[in-house]
Amino acid sequence: MTKLLHHNEKTSLNGGREPLFSQKELLVLAVPLLVEQLLEVTVGMADTMMVSRCGEAAISGVSLVDMINNLIIVLFAALATGGAVVVSQYLGAKDRQDADKSAGQLLLLSGLSGMVIGAVCFVLARPMIRLFYGSIESDVLDAGVKYLQIIALSYPFLALYNGGAALFRSIGNSKISMQISFLMNIINIVGNAVCIFGFKMGVDGVAWPSVVSRVVAAALILRKCYREDAVLTVPKTLRLDGGMAKRILGIGIPSAFENSLFEAGRILVVSMISTFGTVQIAANAVANNLDGMGVIPGKAISLAMITVVGRCIGAGDHEQTVYYTRKLLLWAYITMGLSNGAILLFLRQLVGIYALSGETMELAITLVTIHAGCAIIFWPLSFVLPNALRAANDVKFTMVVSILSMACWRLGFSYLLCVRMGWGAVGVWVAMVIDWTCRVTCFVLRFRSGAWKTKYQA
């Protein structure tokens, strides 16, 4: 599939220039990100498995809120992406002073956004859930409101952690965020087990350990950022710098708008599924968990893509940009083929881990089969390649494509197949594949055109 990107570009580096990244440096960057993504998805699966013991109303309530939670997380991730791109570009241009300044601005913006969003979600938890999902069963609604209000308390700390982790990725040191993520997830899993099985806390038992783990993670990442021997020197006194903040937000806001509308679209299609009852909601939740495993390598490599391409763009080297983009895409195809192949091979056993009824289990198997089979072909070019464009400041194009593809293809076909034709969750997942096809076409053509080369200005 990476041959699609080949258009008047050579696949190796010429001219005697020294490569910006060695094979070892790419692995040192990508492998910890892979482990971190694996930990994140594993904890999500553990949360779902544990709360499933509290009944299908509880798992449905938590899964519905997790869609809102994902919407919030992508806002923080988009801001972190903006900061990581800017820092990487300054490092590529060997401008250490502005790299330090942009690092401080990222942490400041992350903390402020986390506090505002956390307060809004805590106060408006019930109206938000009603707005997104309409008429859902009362016990599912109550479980969702309780979960959202507790988890909202962690948003400021999650935003700070994401910002700090992005800084370490931008300097090629993803090992730090991996280590902290490991500790955060251990706290989460142990806390869940104690609270759910020991204290019988139900939904509360899933939420509170997440809050504690994120507080600890934020404290540790900030401590690392302010160490005297750190590669980046983050200013100890942070004041808003309009010019630098604008540069970060110039990438972060389009990415946030794009990703938040994408997640909002996912929430809308889940609201369509929710009209078919608890069986469909629960099957969709479990399928999302398992499919998260399949895209772990792709997500890790997409994060690495930001650092690598950002550094190449900052150095003004378009040849190396193309070279490393194709190289990382090849890695994504190989690793996602292995991960999704394994899921398909052991699918029934994996779904059997969850406490599901027979009907729910069979539906979950069908949904995972659709996702895993198609992700091997479409996912890398749909979601890894656009990060190369973002790192080159071509954020408006990726935003427009993502929004239009979501609105026209995923939402449009979800309504047609899920609601009008009565396919339920299966219709939504088929519409997802149609959406991916559109993204692949647009992003490949954009990269081949070379239009992204004109977007970055030092």
Predicted regions and their residues:
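Short alpha-helical transmembrane segments in multi-pass integral membrane proteins
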Residues: 1-30, 87-154, 196-253, 309-375, ...
